[in-house]
C-alpha cells in the first residue's frame, strides 16, 4: 500500500497488497459459474476473483453495513421510525469504463459474489444501455453517430429509475436493450423489486452536471481502467471474434460484418473505434475516473494489477 507523496484522497495498492485485505472472505464461486459470467475476450480466472474481487466484496460488505447505520442515525435525528431491517435503503454501486474494457464482466462477477452474503441476498444488475433513446428517436435528433455519448441517453428516465429504487419504491422498471437488434426492445421491462444492492453499469454513469445526476445517488463506484491503446486492441479482437458469434446471426444488426475477411474487419473495427468509441472515452468517460471510489487498473493481458481507493 502506498500513499502518494503529496496529500491525496487516494491510497494505491498493487495486487499483492490488495489481496492481503481479503482476510477470511470465502470464495463462493465455481469455475463453471465464472465461465458463465465472463465476457467475450475476457481472461478473468478464479485467482483474480480471489485476489481482487474477494477483498472488494469484503470492503463493500463493510460499507453496506456502515451506510445502514448512517441512515438509522439520520432517522433517529429526524424522529422518524427506524427502517424495517427486512427492507433497508438500497445500496447503489456504479460501474463505469470504456467499451471493451471489461466493465460488464466486472459487474456480473461482483453481483454473483455480493448475492452470496447472508445480509444482502438480493443484488440486481441494470445496464444503462436500456436508457439509450430508441433508434428512431436518435435519428430524429441526428444522434445515431453519437450513440453511447451522454446526449444519446434518456437521462431523465435514468434518474427517475435510480431515484425510485433509492427511495424505497416497491418496484422500478428499466427499459431493455437488444444488442442483437442494436435497439430498445419495445414494451420490454426489467423489473427491480427493492434490492438490497443495485449495480448500475454503463459508460457514463459517473458523469456530473449542473443538476442532480445518478452519480450523486451512488454509495460506491468503480472505474475499470486501462491504457487507451490496450482497450483499442481489445475492441478490435472482440470485433473479429464476434464475426463468428453475435454477428453471425442473420437477425443481427451487424450481420453484414460477419463475412468480412480479417484485414477488412480490422479496418472496420478501427474506424468505429476512431470515430466513436475513442472520442467518447477521451471526451466523456475518462474525465469521470477521479470520481470513482475504486479504480481497477488492467494490464495489456486484461489482468488487474493495480488499484486506487478513494479514502476521503
From Swiss-Prot:
HAMAP family: Pantothen_kinase_1
Catalytic function, reaction form: (R)-pantothenate + ATP = (R)-4'-phosphopantothenate + ADP + H(+)
Keyword tags: ATP-binding, Coenzyme A biosynthesis, Cytoplasm, Kinase, Nucleotide-binding, Transferase
PANTHER family recorded: URIDINE KINASE
Family that this chain belongs to: Belongs to the prokaryotic pantothenate kinase family.
Annotated InterPro entries: P-loop_NTPase (IPR027417), PanK (IPR004566), PRK/URK (IPR006083)
Enzyme class label: transferase
Statement: the UniProt record of this protein carries the keyword Transcription regulation: no
Any one Gene Ontology BP term: coenzyme A biosynthetic process
Protein name per its UniProtKB record: Pantothenate kinase
EC id: 2.7.1.33
Subcellular location: Cytoplasm
Highest taxon above the source species: Bacteria
Binding site for ATP: 97-104
GO MF term list: ATP binding; pantothenate kinase activity
GO cellular component: cytoplasm
Keyword Transferase: yes
Amino acid at each position: 500500500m502506498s500513499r502518494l507523496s503529496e496529500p491525496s484522497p487516494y491510497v494505491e495498492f498493487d495486487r499483492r497488497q490488495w489481496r492481503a485485505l481479503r482476510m477470511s472472505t470465502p470464495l463462493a464461486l465455481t469455475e463453471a459459474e465464472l465461465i458463465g459470467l465472463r465476457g467475450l475476450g475476457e481472461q478473468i480466472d478464479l485467482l483474480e476473483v480471489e485476489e481482487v474481487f474477494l477483498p472488494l466484496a469484503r470492503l463493500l460488505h463493510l460499507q453496506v453495513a456502515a451506510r445502514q447505520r448512517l441512515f438509522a442515525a439520520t432517522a433517529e435525528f429526524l424522529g422518524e421510525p427506524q427502517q424495517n431491517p427486512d427492507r433497508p435503503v438500497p445500496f447503489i454501486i456504479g460501474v463505469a469504463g470504456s467499451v471493451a474494457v471489461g466493465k460488464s464482466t466486472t459487474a456480473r462477477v461482483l453481483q454473483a459474489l455480493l448475492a452470496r452474503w447472508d445480509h444482502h441476498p438480493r443484488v440486481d444488475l441494470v445496464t444503462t444501455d436500456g436508457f439509450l433513446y430508441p433508434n428512431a428517436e436518435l435519428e430524429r435528433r441526428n444522434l445515431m453517430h453519437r450513440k453511447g455519448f451522454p446526449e444519446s441517453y434518456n437521462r431523465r428516465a435514468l434518474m427517475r429509475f435510480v431515484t425510485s429504487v433509492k427511495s424505497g419504491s416497491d418496484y422500478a422498471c428499466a427499459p431493455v436493450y437488444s444488442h442483437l437488434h442494436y435497439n430498445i426492445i419495445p414494451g420490454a421491462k426489467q423489473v427491480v423489486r427493492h434490492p438490497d444492492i443495485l449495480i448500475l453499469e454503463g459508460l457514463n454513469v459517473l458523469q456530473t452536471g449542473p443538476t442532480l445526476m445518478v452519480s450523486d445517488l451512488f454509495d460506491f463506484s468503480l472505474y475499470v481502467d486501462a491504457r487507451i491503446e490496450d482497450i483499442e486492441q481489445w475492441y478490435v479482437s472482440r470485433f473479429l471474434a464476434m464475426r463468428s458469434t453475435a454477428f453471425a446471426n442473420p437477425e443481427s444488426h451487424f450481420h453484414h460484418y460477419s463475412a468480412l475477411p480479417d484485414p477488412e474487419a480490422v479496418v472496420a473495427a478501427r474506424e468505429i473505434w476512431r470515430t466513436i468509441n475513442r472520442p467518447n472515452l477521451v471526451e466523456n468517460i475518462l474525465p469521470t475516473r477521479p470520481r470513482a471510489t475504486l479504480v481497477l487498473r488492467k494490464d495489456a493481458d486484461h489482468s488487474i494489477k493495480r488499484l486506487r481507493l478513494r479514502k476521503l
